[in-house]
Amino acid sequence: MIIKKVRTQFGVEAEVWKLGYISLDRVAKYGSITMNLYFTEDAEQYIDSKTQLIPEEKFDEYFESGGDLFENCERFMLENCYLFMEDGATHLNVY
């Protein structure tokens, strides 16, 4: 889970981002990660999402070096997705 406060299209702030979808092609070395935004940690429905493509040159670093897949996905998003690279994003290890 990533905590990053953003203003939603409804004009209110939300900050809980959870992994929504992971697509990895280990043969072609590419994929994508989608993070979903929730008002609270316990909310059942997300209100927004952000998808980041995984370029071939970054694939092995994050997805062929071992470790927990979910943690690697969140680390990739924190280090490569502009939204989360801005000040204020925090990774919460919940796995």
Give the positions of each predicted feature:
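Viral virion structural and adsorption modules
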Residues: M1-Y95
